[in-house]
């Protein structure tokens, strides 16, 4: 009987060890292509104004649940356009809590001034957060997304 019990406990661990998870990907600046921006738009529902510049992208695919973070610079004069996104219109106004990118050198969320924090529960167990604020005189958005 103890051997059967041991096998019952070990089986899930062995099974988890056999699962094939993805890779973690970090891109900075010009390494971030339209492909990543389209991915973020599709996952979060965000649309970015023309002239938006990518600063940092981190996709965490090595865990059980995928997650990503993105930092972009929003052109001066397009802040109101960006604020028309659903997450700002219908999301909960509360401080960002996921911060998948917080271990990245480009993730400086705590330095933002005049910030607007929102989050939104998405269909099928997905969740997005966005924080918009001023960083070194520029409008910057920090976006986190996770699938649970």
Over which residues does each language-model region extend?
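Bacterial signal peptide processing site
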Residues: 19-21
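Mature extracytoplasmic domains of secretory-pathway proteins
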Residues: 47-51, 55-114
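Sec-dependent signal peptide recognition
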Residues: 2-12
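N-terminal "mature-domain start" segment
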Residues: 26-55
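Short glycine-/small-residue-rich flexible loop motifs, especially phosphate/cofactor-binding loops
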Residues: 10, 38, 80
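Residues that act as N-cap/strand-start positions at coil-to-secondary-structure junctions
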Residues: 40, 66, 124-126
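An acidic-aromatic pocket/loop used at catalytic or ligand-binding sites
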Residues: 92, 100-148
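C-terminal motif of bacterial Sec signal peptides marking the signal peptidase cleavage site
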Residues: 15-17
């Amino acid at each position: 009987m103890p051997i059967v019990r041991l096998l019952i406990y070990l089986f899930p661990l062995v099974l988890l060890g056999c699962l094939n998870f993805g890779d973690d990907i970090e891109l900075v600046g010009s390494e971030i292509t339209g492909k990543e921006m389209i991915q973020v738009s599709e996952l979060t529902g965000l649309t970015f104004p023309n002239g938006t510049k990518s600063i940092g992208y981190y996709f965490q695919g090595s865990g059980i649940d995928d997650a990503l973070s993105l930092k972009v610079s929003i052109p001066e004069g397009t802040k109101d356009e960006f604020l028309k996104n659903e997450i700002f219109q219908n999301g909960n106004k509360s401080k960002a809590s996921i911060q998948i990118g917080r271990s990245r050198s480009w993730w400086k969320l705590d330095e933002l001034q005049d910030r607007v924090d929102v989050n939104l529960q998405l269909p099928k167990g997905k969740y997005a957060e966005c924080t918009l604020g001023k960083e070194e005189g520029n409008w910057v958005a920090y976006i986190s997304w996770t699938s649970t």
